A protein has these predicted regions:
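Hydrophobic alpha-helical segments within soluble ligand-binding/sensing domains
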Residues: 135-176, 276-296
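Hinge/cleft segment of the Venus flytrap/periplasmic-binding protein
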Residues: 293-336
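Structural motif
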Residues: 79-101, 210-224
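An alpha-beta-alpha
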Residues: 49, 67, 152-202, 302-317
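Bacterial lipoprotein signal-peptidase II cleavage site
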Residues: 22-43
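Beta-alpha junction/loop-to-helix N-cap segments that form part of ligand/metal-binding clefts
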Residues: 84-142, 236-251
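Short beta-strand segments enriched in small/hydrophobic residues
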Residues: 45-59, 174-182, 231-232
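Sec-dependent N-terminal signal peptides of Gram-positive bacterial secreted proteins and lipoproteins
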Residues: 1-28
Length: 336
C-alpha cells in the first residue's frame, strides 16, 4: 500500500512538472509573438509631417513638391498635413500652434514667415525650412554651419545671385532700377539692402515701392514708371504671388523685368539668375528623412545654399524688347 502511494505521488509530481513546462513554453511563445508585433509596429511607424506654406505661388509650390518627393522616395510611411497661410501672419501662427498641439513629428516650413512662426511655436519638434533668404538674420539659426536649435533647412538665395544680377542689369545699360517688395518681409528687406549696396558699387540707383499685400502690387509697380528703366523683383512672396501685375506694367511700358527665380522667367520675366525651387525643397526633404530616421539632428545639420546657379533668359520677352542675347552671357534660353 505504501509502495502504491509512493508511486502515485511520484506520478502526480511528474505531471505537475510537465504542465508547468508546457505552461512556460506557451508563455514564452506568447511573449515572442507580442515582441514581434511591437517590433513590427515600430518598423511600420507612420510619421506625421505638418506643412506650413506662407502663400500659394509656383515657386513655393515647387519647393513643397520637391520636399514631398524626397520623403516618398525614402520609403518612410508619412501623413502630410498641408496648410497655407495665404500671406496672413496671424494664420501662420495658428497653423504652427495647431501642429504643435496635434503632436506632429516634424514641421516643414516653406518661406521665412512660416519658419519664424514654427520656431516661435516649438523648441522641441524638428523644423525644416526652405525658401528662406537669410536664416541667420531671421534668427532661425545661429549660423549656417551650426544651426544650434531644432531648426535647419535650405536657403533660396545663392551668395552670387544679387551681384550677378546687378552686373547683368548694368550690361543691359540700365542705370535706374525699380524694386517692388513687401517691407514687412524680413527676407525682402535683407535682399533690398544688399542690392542697394552692390548697385552703388556699379553706379546704379534703386527706386523703391512697397506693397503690403498682393492687391497693392500693381499700384506700387505703376508708381515707379518714369522713375525706373527696368524692374528687379527679388524673391518676395507678396510680389511674386501677384507677378502678373508686374509683368503687365513692364510689358505696357516696354521695360525689362529681371526676376529672382526661374519659375518667374517662365511666367513672363525677361531673365533671372536662379535655380529650381523643386531642388531646394527636395534637399530639405532629404534632411527631414535623416532626422526622422534618427541619423541626424537639426542643431547639427548645416543649412544649405542652392546649387547650380544659372542665367535663364525668356527669348520671346527679349525679342519683344529688342534685346539681342549675347553668347558671352552664357545664358540658357527659354523658348515659349
Amino acid at each position: 500500500m505504501k509502495n502504491n502511494m509512493k508511486k502515485f505521488s511520484l506520478l502526480l509530481f511528474g505531471l505537475v512538472l510537465l504542465l508547468a513546462a508546457c505552461g512556460g513554453g506557451t508563455e514564452s511563445k506568447g511573449d515572442e509573438k507580442n515582441n514581434a508585433s511591437e517590433s513590427g509596429s515600430k518598423g511600420e511607424k507612420t510619421y506625421k509631417i505638418g506643412i506650413s506654406q506662407y502663400v500659394d505661388h509656383p515657386s513655393l509650390n515647387a519647393a513643397t513638391d520637391g520636399f514631398k518627393k524626397a520623403i516618398e522616395e525614402s520609403g518612410l510611411k508619412v501623413e502630410f498635413d498641408p496648410q497655407t497661410a495665404a500671406g496672413d501672419n496671424s494664420l501662420n501662427t495658428t497653423i504652427a500652434n495647431n501642429f504643435v498641439s496635434s503632436g506632429v513629428d516634424l514641421i516643414f516650413a516653406n518661406a521665412t514667415p512660416s519658419a519664424q512662426a514654427a520656431a516661435a511655436a516649438t523648441g522641441d519638434i524638428p523644423i525644416i525650412f526652405t525658401s528662406v533668404t537669410d536664416a541667420v538674420g531671421a534668427e532661425l539659426v545661429a549660423s549656417m554651419e551650426a544651426p544650434g536649435k531644432n531648426v535647419t533647412g535650405t536657403i533660396d538665395l545663392h551668395p552670387d545671385t544679387i551681384s550677378k544680377t546687378v552686373a547683368f542689369l548694368k550690361e543691359l545699360g540700365v542705370k535706374k532700377v525699380g524694386m517692388v517688395y513687401n517691407a514687412g518681409e524680413q527676407n525682402s528687406v535683407a535682399q533690398v539692402t544688399e542690392v542697394k549696396k552692390i548697385a552703388a558699387e556699379h553706379g546704379l540707383t534703386i527706386e523703391e515701392a512697397s506693397a503690403a499685400t498682393s492687391a497693392d502690387v500693381k499700384q506700387a509697380t505703376e508708381s515707379l514708371v518714369g522713375k525706373a528703366e527696368a524692374f528687379y523683383i527679388i524673391t518676395d512672396n507678396t510680389v511674386v504671388s501677384a507677378l502678373e501685375s508686374v509683368i503687365d506694367v513692364a510689358n505696357t511700358n516696354k521695360l525689362p523685368l529681371i526676376v529672382g527665380e526661374l519659375d518667374s522667367v517662365a511666367r513672363g520675366g525677361l531673365a533671372a539668375y536662379g535655380f529650381q525651387y523643386f531642388d531646394i525643397g527636395y534637399e530639405a526633404g532629404q534632411m527631414a528623412v535623416k532626422i526622422l530616421k534618427g541619423e541626424a539632428k537639426p542643431a547639427e545639420t548645416p543649412a544649405q545654399y542652392p546649387q547650380n546657379l544659372k542665367l535663364v533668359i525668356n527669348k520671346k520677352v527679349a525679342d519683344s524688347l529688342g534685346i539681342d542675347v549675347k553668347d558671352t552671357w552664357g545664358a540658357e534660353l527659354l523658348e515659349q
